[in-house]
Amino acid sequence: MIYLSETRDGKNFRREVSLPHFDIQVDLAVCGLGTAGSLAAFFSAENGLSVLGIEAFTCLGGTHTAGGVAYHYFGTKGGRYEAIDTEVKGFSKRYTCTETEARKLLLEQKFRENKIKTLYRASICGVYLDENKVIGLRVLTEQGILEIGAKIVMDCTADARVVTIAGCKAECGRDTDGQMQPYSLVYMVYDGKNYGFTNVDFGRVNQFDRKALSEAILYARSVRPTEGHDFELLAQTPILGLREGRRIIPEEPATLPDLFADRQTATPMFYSYADLDKHGWDIAFDSELLGDWAIGANLGAYNLTVAVPYKAILPKDFEGILVPCRALGVDRDISSCVRMNPDMKKVAEAASEWATLAVKQGVTLREVKYDHLKEKLQKSGCLKESDNRGCRIDGIRNKQNDMLPSTEVVWITNPEKFEDRLKTEQPGEAIWSAKRMGDHALPTLLRLLNSEDRNTSRHAAFAVSILKSRKAVPLLRQMVKERDDFMLKDCRKHNNLRGCMAIFWLGRLGDREIVPELIDIITNPKETERGVYKQKDLQTTRYRVNDFEDVYFQFVSESVMALIRIGELCEDLRPQIKKGFIDAFSSGEYYHRFTSRDRLSSEGNMVLALKNIAFNFADKW
């Protein structure tokens, strides 16, 4: 039975239709020709498939070109994309001043050489299905509506536009308030010698809300990047840097719980490598497990290796369509790692090889044997076991600004080794090792909890807490009441203060007695007069942000989330906590204790989230 699935006002409608006369019939239709889509189309055409590319914008490359994100952030090397990158560098030296423009031109050349048909300024407005197998598309173009038939469709729209129309299930945003990562706008600049790019992070935006997106675009284009910069601004890039959108529910996902439990897929298509790169500083409102890692153990900037399953790009219960882009099937925590340019280039190759095997063998995507795909990916270097490097410390520079070699993290397995690490300013690995070791670590940690050494005892308190023991609660309360301002030094960015970490763990443990102190932190106007907020050398952000009280924000955001967690566990405390939220946030005056920046700025957006999240939970109670 043939269906046409369409979306109207955010709702899906599927109706039975006759098989249409397709205006264009191809082996592969690629929707969205950005970082992943342009390469998926090119690699597939090189493999011998007939390919149609459909793009809403007016050039190829997406974020990698029109978005101004020219370079790589970590990732793994190897694969067919490296030849393209090498050509781009040569093209740039000969013809353009930047790699973004060179990549646009080179990709256009490759498309023409490989006879890839391209529809620019085109939008998908319907999906044809034979039961749950995608067989074609309805596309709105400048020339009118075209009916496209394809043996396989790839949704590379970044926001799962096509699969959403088809009726596939997807997720979006963080659990606390549905918001996504902050967006950026990239600027082309000139420092008197070289051309380059810089970016400004803004607030969060729901790109599926046309009014909100328009407001975000206008605001971003009104801001000039001035803080800490000495260069001439030449241009703004045409598209916003949206870091997050929908994520499909796939046949096999990659998740943070699996990663931390050392459970890896048996069928990877490549290995992703980066930190859980959450932009913004309100990580208090992310998942508890991410909080354990990034706040409770202070390891947020450690790099992780994610084995990405090949079926993470196959929507659950659907056939004939792949999603090789940012919308692939990973959980939200992992998505902040598996989204970098190298990842998108590798997933493009994996999808092109998978589609090629299916078309040439005359089978469905599910019928393609993984070993055949694996052989292709290993041959090109896209998939290498040497890329499976676990957890590492990377991106560290010395005083001369030289990049130091990355080092592998070796977790502690002998409890007697805890003290040596806990007494340092870098106890994070010991704290997480305790979680991995389990109750076997507890006797040693309880002994260290009574150490006369301040670092040892306080860091042991975090390690005891990660094992869900309440034995360290009195010391955690003491750290909060002191507003312990010691900043750990495990990471190259986003290190935490002990006072904030103590608040986090008291919330995770559901401590009733700390509630009055936390309410005082969020309600007392004189809180900002404490010494911890006056120290100029304390900085929890990646860079100094003028007119933003970042340390105060960390204490308040952790307190809000801790109160929510305690309220979820203790119904009798909910009225007291709810009153605290009302006293803290009902008046707009609270906003100006943090910043005077616009509500659409990154900082303003985070401050507004304090109120929104607090009231959302209180209203549910």
Protein language model features and the residues they cover:
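Conserved N-terminal/central alpha/beta ligand/cofactor-binding core
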Residues: 2-9, 15-25, 43, 49-50, ...
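Flavin (FAD/FMN)-binding glycine-rich loop and adjacent Rossmann-like elements that form
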Residues: 3-14, 19, 63, 140-141, ...
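Structural detector for internal amphipathic alpha-helices that build alpha-solenoid repeat scaffolds
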Residues: 405-407, 424-439, 443, 447-450, ...
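Buried hydrophobic core positions in alpha-solenoid tandem helical repeats
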Residues: 408-422, 444-446, 475-480, 517-522, ...
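Amphipathic alpha-helical segments within extended alpha-helical solenoids and repeat-rich scaffolds
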Residues: 476-487, 519-534, 579-594
